[in-house]
């Protein structure tokens, strides 16, 4: 995921790892993220609750040929560019077939066209377009629009802008130049309780990858059983102390 507004991409990755019961296979060592350590966020029993987790971990599901990188910390100042380089170098050396970045963008910075349409958008690098163009077309998804690079200037060049998207735009631009097959899926959101946004984003991804199947013939999102990680019980802290009442 990208560390972006509402942490939507990170929450969506949590849902994928928890639902598919992906196994932790290693760590992505980097000095670009603020150090952190905590208990196992996906603990299902007392036996595995004491396992430690850190700021960047790698999970795998070999049966689906799926690998997920989860980030749990923010970037150290001026280190985001270095992180992008390390990440894409790892992607190339590991020979990943495709990369999908889950992200979000500030909903209040949408233009009129974006306000009148779906809150979901996608971006594909040129080499990714060749391999998935037909599939994406069949989903009737909406591509992220290009907007003036300098909003106040009407004659400004047009480019992709993702306000609140963290490293999303930098990863996308670097992947274009390095000919990496990358897709960006994002949702326009506001800060707050972003669990519904994460569920929406992961269902958007599921339309394409079909990671889990509907429980009935009705493919509506409500029939998809996403498993909420145990750590989400403390998403907004440990609750109010009873002594207050």
Cite the ranges covered by each PLM segment.
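Internal, hydrophobic cores of structured domains that mediate oligomerization or house catalytic pockets
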Residues: 103-105
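Accessory terminal and edge-of-domain segments that mediate assembly/interaction
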Residues: 1-98, 107-245
